[in-house]
Each structure stands twice: as structure tokens, then as C-alpha cells.
């Protein structure tokens, strides 16, 4: 073998050695076969998925308390929640005849930047207060939806009032045609009952003057106040204007704004109107009529004083029948009736 051949043989051996060493090195670095490598890759993928899930759950678990805390802070700062509750409750007192609330019957449920207010409403019929339903109002941030009224009344107020369905009629407004049947309804009730009656007057009267017109066996519960718009009950845009009034009697519960401690009911009524004027956009949502024009009506009351055109009264049914012969009564609307509870 010549020298050239020997060199070529050495080169081949060296090349084979390098190949063998490279294969051995690769096998040392990658000791797993293809199946095992796929299993390892899949295990890595599963581990990554689990890690992502755990991270997502951790973020969600962190978001929930942060959102909850932020919501409570939102409603707490500036007294937003209390203000919304106060607007809702005071709207009932001055727009819903013979309707009242009780503090312990009001609930608030706060969600993510939302609040749901639920409160029971009561009527005095005879000498007892009866629960007659509940109102539920959902708020997204501080924007309320229309109230959901769940009432258990025989003769509930209309959801969308109009001149034809108004229970208390101004002396300058036309009396609805069906109103003549109300005296027949009252006469047809058993003597052993107490009733609620909406009385419309022939003329405007002062609150004290009106109360003197009723005997001791009839209790005046709510006074409908003339604010300059009740003759037509529509505003400049043709929207029905909500009636306004206030409780005639002192409510000695601490919850009621008409508790008689610092102001008489007329003064409280005026204060409430001015408070609601500052929150009129929200108040309109709560009221049945979709217009309030509070600024105009407050100015009218300041200039002309408080005069009433109607009242809600309650008492023994036989006593209420006597109102038919009263010269100051223009028309009536019979409300709720209960079994005898007059003492």
C-alpha cells in the first residue's frame, strides 16, 4: 500500500471516529426516544395550561374583592347610596297619597357598581297600617331604572296617570265621567267596615280649614296641594305632571321626615320639594307622572302659600257616606276597604 492509500485510510477512520463520537454525544444529550420526547413535550404543554389557569383564577380572585371594594367606595363617597335612598323615600311621601314607609322594611343590595333598593309601602286604613306592596328600584351606578311596583291593592293607582284617571281632581279641572258611581260603591259597602276615600273639593282651602270640615270620626291622611299646574296637569311639553302633597298627620317614628320634631308638616313638605329639585332627574324616575317642574311649582308655593284641593281620608264607612251632603265636597273616589278596626 502506497503512502497515498495509507493517508486516505487514516482519513476514513478519522471521519468514522468523528461520526461515532457525534452520534454518541447526541445520544448522551438526548437519551430519550421519539415517543418519550413527545410525552415530555405534552407534559410541558399540560403544565403550561395549568399554570395559565391558576394565574387566571388568581387574577379573578383578586379582581372580585377589588371590584367589590371599589363599588362600596363609589356608593359611600359623597353619600351616594344614602342620597338615592332618601330621594326614593321622600318621593313616596309627597307623590303617593296615603302611602308611608318603615325603616326596618327597606333593604339595599349592592352588586358590581349597581344597587338594588327594595322597600315595603304601607297605607293607613281605619286605624291600622297595612302593608300594601313593595317597590324595587335597580340602579346602574347612580342611574335608576323605573320602579317595579308589586302592589296588593283592590284599587291601585294607575302606573301612568292622566287627567281621566286622577283620583284627586282640582276645582278647575273636569271630573271624570265614571266618578258619579263612587257614591253608589260607598253606599253598597257593609257598615262594619272602614274605608279610604279620595275627596276632591269645590274650592281651594287652607290645610287647617279643611281638617275642620271633617268630624272627629274621620281622619285626614294626605293633602293634595295646589301648585299652579293641577287644573290641566300637563307641562309645557304636554307631559303629565305628578300630583304633590304631604301627610296631614304627625308620624312619630324617627324614620319619617314628618315626625313633627323640629318642623311642622308644611315646612317639611317645602324642604322636601327643594331637596327633590336638586335631584329632579332621579325623582322623575321614581314618580308615576313623568314631569315634575319643581322649580316652577316651588316658586308658586312661595308666592301663594299652601292651599289644598283634595285630601285622602279614612274612617268608618257609615261616617264617610255623610260626606255626600257636605257642601265642600265635589267628588270622591273610593280606595281600599278593610274590616272594622275603629276604636
Residue locations for each model-derived region?
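Ser/Thr/Pro/Gly-rich low-complexity linker/stalk segments immediately outside membranes or between
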Residues: 75-91
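Juxtamembrane low-complexity tails/linkers enriched in Ser/Thr-Pro and polybasic
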Residues: 34-48
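Extracytoplasmic beta-rich ectodomain segments of secreted or membrane-anchored proteins
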Residues: 125-254
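Short extracytoplasmic
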Residues: 89-122
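N-terminal targeting leaders characterized by basic, low-complexity, disordered sequences
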Residues: 1-30
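Hydrophobic membrane-insertion alpha-helices, especially the h-region
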Residues: 54-72
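Extracytoplasmic/luminal low-complexity segments enriched in Pro/Gly and acidic/polar residues
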Residues: 257-343
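Short, flexible beta-strand-to-coil junctions
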Residues: 23-26, 201-205, 314-318
